[in-house]
Amino acid sequence: MPIETVILREATADDVPFLRAMIWEAILASPTLLNQRGVDAIQQHEEQYWSGWQQHPDPAFVALDTNGRLLGAITLQPNEPSASVQGWRIGMGVEAEVRGQGVGRHLVGRAIEFAKVAGAAYVNLFVDPANTHAIALYQHAGFVAVGTRDALIEMRFNL
């Protein structure tokens, strides 16, 4: 049953622990990625990314319920390091107990809206082929599979 009211807001520095936890949840749901790169290498990459986030934050949004409980998060990283970003790569995680209740749909919609306003040409993501629920969510939002990288499916939403 969908959560009736999902509140979305920009993430702040205070949200970094939650953002990290949600992205780590998404990584753990990706056995293909874990097997290919190894937990240690992924942890090292994540540590470097989040330590730099405080000084140069990428866009990120959190979803809350009406009581202020954090439900999920989505991050956007530029696909190319330039002033005119053509594509944003998203990473998303939703608390286990509220998956399938519309939180992810709201977060993905907000990321697409952000990218449109920013003038990007597309939004993309990488998803484990075994994560069929996530694939269905992204397809429902209008993403299409465009290839693979490191055995993960690349999905894209053209703006």
Where are the predicted features?
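Conserved N-terminal entry element of GNAT/NAT acetyltransferase domains
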Residues: M1-P17, A21, L159
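C-terminal "cap" of GNAT-fold acetyltransferases
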Residues: I3, E25, A121-I135, Q139-L159
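Short, solvent-exposed beta-strand edge segments and adjacent coil->beta transition regions
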Residues: I3-V6, G87-R89, A120
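Acetyl-CoA-dependent GNAT
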Residues: E10-A13, E25-L33, R37-E97, V108-R110, ...
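Short alpha-helical
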Residues: D14, F18, L70, T132-H133
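Conserved GNAT acetyl-CoA-binding A-motif
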Residues: V108, A115-F126
